[in-house]
Amino acid sequence: MEDFVRQCFNPMIVELAEKAMKEYGEDPKIETNKFAAICTHLEVCFMYSDFHFIDERGESIIVESGDPNALLKHRFEIIEGRDRTMAWTVVNSICNTTGVEKPKFLPDLYDYKENRFIEIGVTRREVHIYYLEKANKIKSEKTHIHIFSFTGEEMATKADYTLDEESRARIKTRLFTIRQEMASRGLWDSFRQSERGEETIEERFEITGTMRRLADQSLPPNFSSLENFRAYVDGFEPNGCIEGKLSQMSKEVNARIEPFLKTTPRPLRLPDGPPCCQRSKFLLMDALKLSIEDPSHEGEGIPLYDAIKCMKTFFGWKEPNIVKPHEKGINPNYLLAWKQVLAELQDIENEEKIPKTKNMKKTSQLKWALGENMAPEKVDFEDCKDVSDLKQYDSDEPEPRSLASWIQSEFNKACELTDSSWIELDEIGEDVAPIEHIAGMRRNYFTAEVSHCRATEYIMKGVYINTALLNASCAAMDDFQLIPMISKCRTKEGRRKTNLYGFIIKGRSHLRNDTDVVNFVSMEFSLTDPRLEPHKWEKYCVLEIGDMILRTAIGQVSRPMFLYVRTNGTSKIKMKWGMEMRRCLLQSLQQIESMIEAESSVKEKDMTKEFFENKSETWPIGESPKGVEEGSIGKVCRTLLAKSVFNSLYASPQLEGFSAESRKLLLIVQALRDNLEPGTFDLGGLYEAIEECLINDPWVLLNASWFNSFLTHALK
């Protein structure tokens, strides 16, 4: 490319371009595409101004070879190609003599006929995109913009093209020739792809006063002034050679770029320790529902009425007893709390009119379970700032936990279909704009695939619980309100159904800040015997509360019914996000849409119908130790939805960190798979950043183990 530039452009232009690059600390030998771009831009500016004059009468004329004695003045002042100081001097002098507003950025030309500055753009991309970038950058009504492309297109402010047709045609022809010359030498593709968008840093953004002093104090070593540092930074090209740039920056940095090969990456190290435990705000696969079909009782839709009605469908209650104690808690209190719920529900029955809400008596067991009076007393800072040994509580490091198999089972269950529909067809709200036919069709297909999915049940359950808890937290701040955990669905036959999963009792909730915590006790029905995976239920006290008759293929069997009780907490901001869990539907729909778009652009027609209706085709779902798992399009929809839902249910700082850091490694591995020969430095540091997020969170540990499966198969 460098040779081509020296052959193709006038030596004066080449020299100016080299000077401009050196002024910014760039090397024409390394950044050859930029070198070519600067030469092209200079040449267009000169051609723009060539042969255009203003005669004695002030008229604009074109003179290609005229009388050297004629009194002609150049129509355009060329600003581009001068060194910065000189260029600003010219601009200032024009502004002083003509009264034109001074531009923020150095323009390329000044037009003495139209009395305006002109910004010339030459782009390898779409003219209108580049035009908008330029306009956005200079933000000035007064500077006229004129953009040319290598394909013969042009765009100018208010479609005012300044020059006559023929002059512009000369420029377009020259650009087209440059393009063809490059293409014949195999240079065009790299040149076309190397164009970056306009920088939108204000060139003359003045910093004064304290900020200026702070800026001067915080310069890196070896820089005398902010301007000096700025000029240096402006000269940075991201595709320059990195090692050189880094060693220039500081004597201490010596980054060696190591090639990233198939043998380079190692698997992520998952922590050792006891197996991780369940930490979701409500039970997932282990939940049990007491349900009523076609509810039509008095007060239907009032949660407490619905709950009592559901409780009455079950006849196998028995004297509760503890089958799996909570290691650290006072277990009899959990037992007493459940007995209190049963007793107070019984009391409601005996009243003439059932109330709409129920506040529990503040018994000692509930006060203990809800942490009443447990918070350390808040003291005003003024009263204790003189205490000599004032210090923050020591908090223990979290204990590392190992991956347990239950979380993969939870995820598999979330992807399965249930026999009920949890959302109506229009649940994934309409777009704001009138939705086009295709988008509506996609949404309907997608809804059909996920409406019966267990992950969708979790969404509706989460939305209900969080909404009810946030409402109660605001409406009954001091009360221990009893909140039924309810969901609604439709059976296969389309009959409405109301389900009760259990109850929540909320603690005091004076929530001033988004992060202030409200404690609650959850009590949830289940048929899962906690003794099968005791490690999963570390945070729970589990009672046996009844026997349920189940109809199976071999007839009726009786199974013990358990109640999973635990103390938990949440905050306003967490409840707000919980209420918005329906967004998971939208997120996974968008992921599916991008798959359809990719397929459609290959086939050059909309593939929505084929995508959903071709049942024989399988799609990659994820990686497992067995290899890449594949499944039907419906399975893909449900898997993406389940991932999104679990990201919400198991949201945590560990997940945030893991997602952000592992993505970097993922991109490097993908670059390797695409034969892009990626290089890295400090790969060890990246592994450290990823692995410091692998502590004890079940969902993060599962994602890390999936990531390891991906690494294994990606690098085979």
UniProtKB/Swiss-Prot annotation:
Motif (Nuclear localization signal 1 (NLS1)): 124-139
Domain of life: Viruses
Cofactor note: Binds 2 manganese ions per subunit.
A single GO cellular-component term on record: host cell nucleus
Enzyme Commission code(s) on record: 3.1.-.-
Localization per Swiss-Prot or TrEMBL: Host cytoplasm; Host nucleus
BP GO annotations: cap snatching; DNA-templated transcription; symbiont-mediated suppression of host gene expression; symbiont-mediated suppression of host mRNA transcription via inhibition of RNA polymerase II activity; viral RNA genome replication; viral translational frameshifting
GO molecular function terms listed in the Swiss-Prot or TrEMBL record: endonuclease activity; metal ion binding; RNA binding
Record PTM text: Phosphorylated on serines and threonines by host kinases, including human casein kinase II.
Binding residues annotated for Mn(2+) 1, in chain numbering: H41, D108, E119, I120
Keyword RNA-binding: no
Keyword Metal-binding applies: yes
Cofactor: Mn(2+)
UniProt KW keywords: Cap snatching, Endonuclease, Eukaryotic host gene expression shutoff by virus, Eukaryotic host transcription shutoff by virus, Host cytoplasm, Host gene expression shutoff by virus, Host nucleus, Host-virus interaction, Hydrolase, Inhibition of host RNA polymerase II by virus, Manganese, Metal-binding, Nuclease, Phosphoprotein
Binding positions for Mn(2+) 2 per the UniProt entry: E80, D108
Subunit structure: Influenza RNA polymerase is composed of three subunits: PB1, PB2 and PA. Interacts (via C-terminus) with PB1 (via N-terminus).
Family: Belongs to the influenza viruses PA family.
Protein name: Polymerase acidic protein
